[in-house]
Each structure stands twice: as structure tokens, then as C-alpha cells.
């Protein structure tokens, strides 16, 4: 029997887990993952850190593990994303995930390699767009520069060329998240 205990989450795993976790293989890797999280909590507590900020990771883990059709790859992807951080950056990662959608934070990590400060993600994130051209058009429109331009001239603007100029300061992910490099 394995019991995973945290102030916000308690999961007790008995010898017969088939009703909760399905196959024996899933039971095995679920146990391994819960042991990994328990180890991380012990590390945090050994450093006299307040582990309450770790709650969102624990909740996400419990949610992932209790999903019937979650795959090992999905759990491992989650593990890879959060465990790449040392304890100094894990709190910023959690804070950023609380402020923004997890997918946005993960896209930022894919672009920058880490979350040094939660504010860096919040400041860099510009929104989600279909293309860099859409982002460029929105930026110009937000500045009010198109208000006095006749519609027929506006249609002649080459937004692709303008978007290319934005690539010096901004990047767009495959999911359309735009980040400012200069923040």
C-alpha cells in the first residue's frame, strides 16, 4: 500500500488499484509518479520552505492520475515540464500557471527555456493570434494609426512585411501565442 499525503490532497493506493487506475502498467507508473512528487515535497520541507505553493502541482497531478484515459506520455510530459526547474524557479512557474493558462506558460518555456520570474511570463505574453500578420495588424490598430486611413488604402497594406519587422521583438508559437523578447 502507498499513501500520498499533502495538506490539500490525499491519495491512498492499495494492492487492488484496478478499479481506479485500470491496467497494471498504469498502476505501476502512477505509483512511481506519486513517489516522485512525495520526494519533491520532502526536498522542499527539508529546505524549510513553505510547501503550500506546491498545491497546484499536487492538484494537477491528482487530476491527471485519476483521469481514465490519461496516458503515460501525458503524465511524463507534465513531469518533464515542471521537474526541469530547480526549486528557485518552481514557485515562479506555479505563480505564472495560476495567472495564465498552463499552455501559455509551457509555450513560453518552449521559447525561453525556463521561467525565471512569473512577471517575465506575464509581461512577455501579448495574446493569441492566428498569425504574426494578425498580431501586427492588431498592434498598429491599437496605436490608432489606422483610424484616419481610407479603407481602400488599408487593404493595400502588406501586413506580411510589417509582421516580418515585428519578428525582431516578438515571436509566435505554433499555437499562436505571441511573446515579447524585450521584456
Briefly describe each language-model feature range.
Residues 1-183:
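Acidic interaction surfaces
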